[in-house]
Amino acid sequence: MNSDTSPALWIKDPLAILADGAERGVVVQDGRIVELVAAGREPRAPAVKTFDADAHVVLPGLINTHHHFYQTLTRAVPAALDRELFPWLQVLYPLWARLTPEAVDLSSTLAMAELMLSGCTLTTDHHYVFPKGLEDGIDIQVAAAKRLGLRALLTRGSMNRSQRDGGLPPDNVVQDEDTILADSERLVARYHQAGDGAIIQIALAPCSPFSVTTSLMRATAELAERLNVRMHTHLAETEDENRYCLEIHRCRPLDYLEECGWLNGGPGWRMACISTPTSSRASPAPERPSRIAPAATRRWRPALARSARWKRPASPLASASTARLRTILRT
C-alpha cells in the first residue's frame, strides 16, 4: 500500500443502499468510493478496516447549494420574526455589523456541523457582510471547513451599494469595489482547487441587485471568467426586489443579470431564487450553464438543474437538510 494513502474502509452489508450492484456495501479510500461490492461478493482488495452497517442505510452525501453561516448566530430575533425580506434585513443588518472573527468561526463551525449531522458532505456558503475587522472572513471559513473535513464551495460575497447610495445595507457593512475585487482574486489564488477531487473552491458572489452596483456586477463577471471560477447571487427573491429593479435598473432581475454579462457562458453561475418571476423572461435559455435553488421552479424545469439550499438560517431552525431533500425528491 502506498504510504501516502489512508487505509481502505469497507462499509459492509448495509440494511439498504441507494446504489445498484452494491448490496454488500462500498469500499472507501482517501475520501473516495473505490469499489461497489455486489451481492455474494467480497472486495477485490482486502479492506484494512471494516464497518458493520447492517443497522444502517447508506445514502450519497447530500449537497447544500446555498447558506449563510453567520446568520445562525441571530436565530429567532423577536423583532425579525414574520417579516418580509427587506424589513427582515433592516432589523438584522445592525446585528451583523458587529460580527467578529470569533463569531464567524463559531457560526461557520456550528452551521457545518449541523449540515454534516444531517448527511451533507458538500456545502456552499454565501458570506457577504464585511464590517471593519472582518476582512479575513473567508479565510476563517476555509480553516473551519478544513478542520471539520467538509468539502465546501465558499463564495466571496460582496456589497458596495449602501443606504447612502440608494441601497438597502447600512454603510458600515459594505466595501468599495476595488477592495472586493482584489480580495476575490487573492482568495482564488490562495484557496481555489480546480479539477476532480477538490475539497475547497471559491466562487464570486455579489449579494443582490439591491446591494451592489452595476459596475461591480459586471466586473465580477469579467473576473470570474478570467479566473475560471463560478458566480453566485440572490435573484428575484421577492416582489420588493422586482419593484426595486424596475425602478432603479428599468428592467426585471433576470434581464438585469443579462445586462451585467452574467449569462454569457463561462464556468456558470448559481442563484438562490425564491419567488417565480412574472415577466415573460421567466427562465434562462437551456444552453446557459446554471443551477438554481428555488422554492418553486416547475415552469423553469427544462432549463435548470434544481438543488437543495438553506435559506434564512437566522430563522428559528437548525441547518438540517434532510427534510428539504424529501421536498426536492417529491417534485
Name each model-derived stretch.
Residues 14, 31, 55, 66, ...:
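Divalent metal-coordination and catalytic microenvironments
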Residues 61-72, 230-239:
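Histidine-centered catalytic micro-motifs
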Residues 75-126, 131-151, 181-196:
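Alpha-helical scaffold segments that flank or form the walls of functional sites
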Residues 1-45, 56-58:
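N-terminal metal-binding scaffold of metallo-dependent hydrolase/deaminase domains
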Residues 76, 164, 239-251, 279-284, ...:
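Histidine/acidic-residue-rich catalytic or RNA/ligand-binding cores of hydrolases
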Residues 276-278, 284-321:
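A conserved active-site cap/scaffold subdomain adjacent to cofactor or substrate pockets
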Residues 131-273:
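Metal-coordinating catalytic core of metallo-dependent amide/deamination hydrolases
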Residues 259-266, 308-331:
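His/Asp/Glu-enriched, well-ordered alpha-helical/loop segment
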